[in-house]
Amino acid sequence: MFGNMKEMLKQAQNMKSQMKKIKKELESIEVEGISANGACKVTMTADMKTQNVEINETLLSSEAYVIENAIKVAVNNALEDAKDTSAKKLKAVTGGLT
């Protein structure tokens, strides 16, 4: 009984250590989201920190709602990619428990 408990604690500590490594790795992986027309590009890390936003100069002459929509689409695409990347990395550690 206590042997199982020791083994479970050991596994939990190992998983915690691996999770720290994954978290650090996610901080260095960059993903991009691009608007449908390519006029806006957002770069963020896989831990969902925005690194850069690029707006094509031709987009700047558009109406505000067009610019807003392009930024929204690019951000959402980058977030989706960051979530997918993060989930894949975490699944490798947790065995699909996430």
Predicted segments, located by residue:
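Short, functionally important structural connectors and interaction interfaces within domains
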Residues: 1, 18, 47, 51-52, ...
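Long amphipathic alpha-helical segments used for membrane anchoring, targeting, substrate engagement
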Residues: 1-28, 32, 81-98
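Residue-level signature of catalytic and energy-coupling elements of molecular machines
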Residues: 12, 48, 71
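N-terminal intrinsically disordered, cationic/polar leader segments
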Residues: 32-53, 59
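A short, polar/charged loop-to-alpha-helix boundary motif
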Residues: 60-69
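Stable alpha-helical structural segments in soluble proteins, enriched in small hydrophobic residues
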Residues: 70, 74-85
